[in-house]
């Protein structure tokens, strides 16, 4: 007997069909081309797995402050049966749901998945996979933390002794050995960081942590206190919009790199050993200006904030809100490696080292795009792939995991974190649907 579809399932199927056939181009149309120039600018309705884009500074419009809008997403429940959309050959499963503000995720050497539930001040641990695809076990590793975000295991290798946590106001660590599901000792405070706060267009509170490849440097990213306040006259911007270098014991060494407005996600390129940042650029200059970016970070490098934007013939372009400021720095502004569409809010990133995905993915990057609010046409809300050649960016990026928005311009999912599972599959945290997704390759090779 054929049973009638449940109404919610029918609505979900119709919604998904409309989404696929309505506002979204077929990815096959662009799988073998790279969109450049004005064609590379996009919105969520035209994001689809397999589409590649290559934005350059020559493609960028002039600043247009009059275009700026406050267009935050309307978050709605995930329609029943709806999943993120991955490239052909990939399978997406729901790994965990009902979470409270799931943010950054990192995989421990033994394969356990650590999650920062920033709003509740908790670090959770997920272990294994049940027959239904969900996590087999979930534990609270630690709580009572201050908006935790960054997670790093030290030393590198199969037997770490510590797990470091980036609170919004400092760095702490817990004793840790492989397999620990609950902290076996209290948090040890190592260093203070400038305190955070949640403000639209500023007050960036996330603090990511990574160790250099040789293990001698602890690098902490600290976003700006404001959208674009002049740090000369705003002391609250001290040691913000920077990557700060510490020893593993928490001794401050120096500002490792500056002018990075909000480096939310850090990663070490395993081939080159270089630090990379996934960075949110400033707001208020127009729908398509300036692009967010993902880049390798030069030690002692300057990336422009707040006085300059990247991409000028002499280095930087003066931010129109800071005319004439610091001309001596203009030539020092570094142009990033990968320009992502403007206001996409690029968050956690990683470099893929596994073998579960096809070989062409080895060494490429992935980054979570949380989605725009300062743009008339909503964009982002996806995970992107960052093609690499011998550890160097090609400048392109590719839509990888999409489908988090609906045809009526509402949003059901917002990717935040990406982590590689021990078997080489991918986890994606999503604070829109309060979930973690599991992406694996099941196609032919």
Could you say what each language-model-derived stretch is?
Residues 33-87, 160, 172, 206, ...:
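Beta-propeller domain segments
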Residues 83, 110-135, 179:
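Beta-propeller domains
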Residues 94-99, 140-146, 190-201, 255-259, ...:
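Surface loop/turn motifs at the tips and blade-to-blade linkers of beta-strand repeat domains
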Residues 102-103, 122-156:
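Blade-loop segments of beta-propeller domains
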Residues 120, 135, 168, 184, ...:
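A detector of repeated loop/turn-to-beta-strand junctions in beta-rich toroidal repeat architectures
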Residues 137-138, 144-148, 152-154, 161, ...:
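Asp-box/WD-like beta-propeller blade repeats and closely related beta-sheet repeat scaffolds
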């Amino acid at each position: 007997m054929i049973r009638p579809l449940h109404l919610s399932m029918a609505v979900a199927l119709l919604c998904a069909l409309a989404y696929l056939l309505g506002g979204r181009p077929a990815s096959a149309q662009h799988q073998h081309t790279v969109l450049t120039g004005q064609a590379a600018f996009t919105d969520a309705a035209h994001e689809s797995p397999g589409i590649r884009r290559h934005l350059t500074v020559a493609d960028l419009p002039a600043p247009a402050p009059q275009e700026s809008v406050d267009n935050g997403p309307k978050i709605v429940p995930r329609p029943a049966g709806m999943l993120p959309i991955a490239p052909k050959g990939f399978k997406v499963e729901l790994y965990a749901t009902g979470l409270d503000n799931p943010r950054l995720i990192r995989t421990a050497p033994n394969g356990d998945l650590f999650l920062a539930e920033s709003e509740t001040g908790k670090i959770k641990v997920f272990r294994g996979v049940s027959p239904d695809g969900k996590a087999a076990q979930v534990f609270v590793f630690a709580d009572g933390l201050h908006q935790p975000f960054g997670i790093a295991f030290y030393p590198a290798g199969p037997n770490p002794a510590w797990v470091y946590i980036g609170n919004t106001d400092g760095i702490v660590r817990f004793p840790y050995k492989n397999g620990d599901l609950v902290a076996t000792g209290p948090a040890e405070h190592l260093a203070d960081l400038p305190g955070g706060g949640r403000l639209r267009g500023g007050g960036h509170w996330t603090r990511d942590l990574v160790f250099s490849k040789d293990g001698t440097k602890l690098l902490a990213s600290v976003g700006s206190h404001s959208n674009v306040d002049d740090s000369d006259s705003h002391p609250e911007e001290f040691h913000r919009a920077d990557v700060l270098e510490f020893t593993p014991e928490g001794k401050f060494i120096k500002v490792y790199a500056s002018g990075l407005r909000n480096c939310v996600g850090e990663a070490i390129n395993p081939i080159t050993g270089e630090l990379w940042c996934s960075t949110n650029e400033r707001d208020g200059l127009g729908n398509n200006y300036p692009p967010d970016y993902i880049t390798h970070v030069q030690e002692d490098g300057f990336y422009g904030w707040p006085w300059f934007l990247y991409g000028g013939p002499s280095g930087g372009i003066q931010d129109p809100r800071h005319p004439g400021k610091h001309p001596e720095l203009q030539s020092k502004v570094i142009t990033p490696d990968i320009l992502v569409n403007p206001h996409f809010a690029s968050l956690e990133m990683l470099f893929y080292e596994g073998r579960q995905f096809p070989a062409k993915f080895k060494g490429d990057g992935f980054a979570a795009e949380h989605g725009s609010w300062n743009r008339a046409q909503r964009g982002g809300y996806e995970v992107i792939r960052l093609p690499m050649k011998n550890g160097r960016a090609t400048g392109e990026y590719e839509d990888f995991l999409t489908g988090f928005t609906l045809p009526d311009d509402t949003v059901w999912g917002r990717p935040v974190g990406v982590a590689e599972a021990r078997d080489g599959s991918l986890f994606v945290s999503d604070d829109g649907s309060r979930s973690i997704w599991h992406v694996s390759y099941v196609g032919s090779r």
